[in-house]
Regions:
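The feature captures the beta-strand-to-loop junction immediately N-terminal to the Walker
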Residues: 34-36
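Helix-to-loop junction immediately C-terminal to a conserved catalytic motif
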Residues: 49
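Conserved ABC transporter NBD signature motif
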Residues: 57-65, 74
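Conserved ABC ATPase "signature" region
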Residues: 111-128
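Conserved ABC ATPase signature
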Residues: 133-137, 141
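Conserved catalytic motifs of ABC-family nucleotide-binding domains
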Residues: 154
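Catalytic Walker B motif of ABC-type/P-loop ATPase nucleotide-binding domains
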Residues: 158-162
């Protein structure tokens, strides 16, 4: 289980971006972090894996406080998939192998090789693509490679920062479906920052809304209603309703 308790964060010489944030996520849950631009969604993700130093609060993952752990220890437990795909001039297989780096001592082992092969197969990366260079494959395939790298880390917590923002609708569905299935299959915790509420309701079972640096709502996605969305998002809508779990926002 992940328990975030009274977490606050402010960049230097700025007001608090996150103020007393508390929420919990169980194994097997897929949590969507929602909110307006500047609400602190990506900042929260970076606090969870200590990219940003948290001065106040705790992040307890399976009874261990990540805030008190060293970076290399966190890397064994937490994987982050960002919206920007690394532009390294390496092969697909080598990119996925980087996911094992936190676990290795001096060299990669047969176990590392097995885990990497399994990760690529599970994500659906064809064997004839293993030797292809990252720069030569499509955006959708690149994002699958980054997911395979995260899976190769064998994480307890998978963080995703707008992982489908640069993809077309078809590839958005493919990637999020893969993530949803992996979270259930591996019984890990998944947290995604996402702007599209329809996608959040389709693939996630939990939601966390941030507004004015605080938690506005935390609960099941089924509890999301149109008034809540209107309150959180800075939109002027002539249509604002949920119908068959589809939210429509029309300017």
């Amino acid at each position: 289980m992940l328990e975030v308790k009274n977490l606050s964060f402010a960049y230097k010489n700025n007001k608090e971006i996150l103020n007393n944030i508390s929420f919990g996520v169980e194994k097997g849950d897929f949590l969507a972090i929602l909110g307006n631009n500047g609400a602190g969604k990506s900042t929260l993700l970076k606090c969870l894996n200590k990219i940003l130093k948290v001065e106040k609060g705790s992040v307890i993952l399976n009874s261990q406080d990540l805030i008190k752990m060293k970076t290399f220890e966190i890397a064994k437990k937490v994987a982050l998939v960002g919206q920007n795909i690394p532009s390294l001039d390496i092969s697909v297989r080598d990119m996925v192998m980087l996911g094992r780096k936190p676990h290795m001592k001096w060299k990669f082992t047969e176990e590392d090789d097995r885990i990497v092969e399994d990760a690529m197969a599970r994500i659906g990366i064809d064997k004839d693509m293993h030797s292809s260079f990252i720069s030569n494959i499509s955006g959708g395939e690149c994002q699958k490679v980054v997911l395979a790298r995260a899976l190769a880390q064998s994480p307890e917590l998978l963080l995703l920062d707008e992982p489908t923002s640069s993809l077309d609708i078809k590839n958005q569905y493919i990637v999020l479906n893969l993530v949803k299935d992996l979270i259930k299959e591996k019984n890990i915790i998944g947290i995604v920052v996402i702007h599209d509420i329809n996608l959040a309701m389709r693939y996630c079972n939990k939601a966390l809304f941030l507004k004015d640096s605080q938690v506005y709502f935390s609960g099941n996605v089924e509890e999301i209603n149109s008034h809540m969305i209107y309150d959180v998002y800075d939109v002027k809508s002539s249509i604002h309703e949920i119908k068959d779990q589809k939210i429509m926002l029309v300017d």
